[in-house]
Design a protein with these regions (language model features):
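N-terminal secretory signal peptides that target proteins for export/translocation
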Residues: 1-4
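Bacterial N-terminal signal peptides
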Residues: 8-20
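C-terminal and inter-domain tail/linker signature
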Residues: 25-343
């Protein structure tokens, strides 16, 4: 079913007010920190990471900081080893020949949250970082990052994850949408959730996927690849990058995934972008229960134990109510590891 657009209702103020009071009301209606303001906080935190100096960022005394689901003090983890971060105004030369200048900024003004998705290097190793901030009263109270480095991903495919190539990312269109083209944050988050949940159901039913949807994993295009081999009907375990986003879900491409634990991070309504994080648990899924002589299905099998967990950071682009782009960074995680945040 096609998602219906929310109806905008104009409310008229019944009580008259003087012209002198109007500027004060207008000032009160403006957010304490708008899109540009939130972007400034992102840049200050990124610069503090580059400086290896948390004191250079406007952090709240009780700021909470996680990296790849683990709680760390500001200054620990990537913060202490970063050698380059693609920021506004940077060129390719700042990250080295084997990286890129890809960077994308997000803002959810209503919730006081900002985010970043871009290329980084850690002691010379190319990588990508997804970052979320929450700003309260002019201070950063939450910092959540997913950092994926080339050396920590697929190891040539040994663990089923593609090797990271930061040069392969293609930035989604990030221009501001006109008011009539925007969808409610609730609808956008729900659409992202349906896509993630469908990785366990093996069905694209109910997922608002556009016909031109493209997915990339660690910079590698994994849908709609023109010269990729088609799935082998004689081999149910075969997987193909030739299929589109919907057909890929329906083909059983993700059949090894038994559980997806996800949470939306930032919904940028003005740009049609959703940032999410997920822990994806994989195992050996048994054959579905067969029908008995009376036509009833046998008892459902026990829950499938996790054999491998991957941490995913996702950027989902929506246009006209459809998902048109899915950019994923992923790395191995401890088995059954939590995301590190509630919700």
């Amino acid at each position: 079913m096609r998602l219906s657009r929310g109806i905008c209702i104009a409310l008229a103020l019944a009580a008259p007010f003087t012209l002198a009071a109007a500027p004060a009301l207008a000032a009160e209606s403006r957010p304490a920190c708008d899109r540009d303001c939130l972007g400034g906080f992102v840049d200050r935190v990124l610069q503090a990471m580059m400086d290896h100096a948390p004191a250079h960022a406007p952090l709240a005394p009780d700021v909470r900081h996680t990296e790849n689901g683990a709680a760390l003090k500001p200054g620990e983890g990537f913060w202490s080893t970063a050698t380059a971060i693609a920021m506004a105004g940077d060129g390719l030369s700042t990250l080295g020949r084997n990286s890129s200048a890809y960077r994308l900024y997000f803002a959810d003004v209503a919730s006081g949250q900002a985010a970043y998705f871009g290329a980084v290097t850690d002691k010379g190793a190319p990588g990508m970082m997804m970052l979320r901030l929450r700003v309260i009263a002019g201070k950063v109270s939450e910092i959540e990052t997913v950092v994926v480095l080339q050396e920590a991903t697929g190891q040539g495919g040994a663990d089923g994850l593609p090797d990271l190539d930061p040069r392969g990312f293609d930035e989604p269109e990030a221009t501001l949408l006109a008011g009539g083209e925007r969808w409610s944050p609730t609808i956008m988050a729900a659409a992202a959730g349906r896509y993630l949940d469908s990785m366990t159901t093996g069905s694209s039913a109910g997922v608002p996927l556009g016909a031109d949807c493209v997915r990339r994993d660690n910079g590698i295009r994994t849908t709609g690849v023109p010269d990729a081999k088609r799935p082998d009907p004689a081999n149910p375990a075969s997987r193909s990058y030739a299929l589109g986003c919907a057909a890929q879900l329906d083909s059983g491409f993700f059949r090894g995934i038994v559980r997806v634990r996800w949470r939306p991070l930032v919904v940028d309504q003005e740009r049609g972008l959703v940032m999410a994080a997920a822990m994806v648990d994989q195992g050996t899924r048994p054959e579905p229960p067969k029908k008995t002589a009376r036509g009833r299905r046998a008892q459902a099998p026990e829950p499938v134990p996790t054999e491998f967990t991957a941490l995913l950071g996702l950027i989902i682009k929506m246009s006209d109510g459809k998902i048109t782009r899915v950019e994923v960074i992923e790395r191995p995680a401890a088995k059954d590891m939590a995301l590190g945040w509630p919700g």
